[in-house]
Amino acid sequence: MSGHNKWANIKHRKAAQDAKRSKIFTKLIREIIVAAREGGGNPDTNPRLRAVLEKAREANMPKDTVERSIKKGTGELEGEKYEEIIYEAYAPGGVALYILALTDNKNRTAQELRHILSKNGGSLAESGSVAWIFERKGAIEISASKISDMDEFTLLAIDAGAEDIEEGDPVIVYVAPESLTAVKEALAKNGFEGESKITYKPKNTVKVTGSDAEKVLKLIDALEDNDDVQEVFGNFDIDDAELEAIMAKLEG
């Protein structure tokens, strides 16, 4: 899975850059509204809301914006009705994409995504043709600097309920989605605090290099720039050095 861990690190850096714009707030507000609508406004009993509130804190979202978003989700305030939609797509090089969107107009979103895909060498896929490649998992990202003994950490994580551990920086601990909070808390008690989220992990990957690799990353960047798109997952495998070089070029 070379490239995927580096990708997690780059996406974290991208999120920090996005935070300088208002775009990340737009996405977080939608996520808070939907999480509160589905599981209630109390983060203690709503793991999904708890996870997105953590992201909101990291992005320095104003407290009143967070509270208004929760109230819109619970119905205490009138708000937009967002629908969760998953789009499946193909990128250059045979890479599969799993696109998570929150939209108040699915026809508009489908049209916009179709345009972005076709402009960047991709295409929408039939429902079900890509979904089987990805597994829904909980993921905890921990800075490698916090881990002095990887073997010891691995044993601790497995005892806590980890299913898989991906080395790199950050170290990524994969767990069953329903175990995410418990495993995160167990690791934190032992000094390994990290960021948690729900992710979609590919069962297999496709090696891409050169122009195909650049096209894949450019396409994902364009998709995630769309306000309706929350996150894009791909089963690409790009060497770390090449991935870093391409992202530096795209960011420049």
UniProtKB/Swiss-Prot annotation:
Chief subcellular location: cytoplasm
Keyword annotations of the record: Cytoplasm, DNA-binding, Transcription, Transcription regulation
Pfam families, A to Z: TACO1_YebC_N, Transcrip_reg
GO molecular function, one term: DNA binding
Domain of life: Bacteria
Subcellular location: Cytoplasm
Keyword Lipid metabolism: no
GO biological process terms on file: regulation of DNA-templated transcription
GO cellular component: cytosol
Entry's family note: Belongs to the TACO1 family.
Entry-linked PANTHER family: TRANSCRIPTIONAL REGULATORY PROTEIN YEBC-RELATED (PTHR12532:SF6), TRANSLATIONAL ACTIVATOR OF CYTOCHROME C OXIDASE 1 (PTHR12532)
HAMAP family to which the protein is assigned, alphabetical: Transcrip_reg_TACO1
Name of the protein in its database record: Probable transcriptional regulatory protein Fnod_1106
Organism field: Fervidobacterium nodosum (strain ATCC 35602 / DSM 5306 / Rt17-B1)
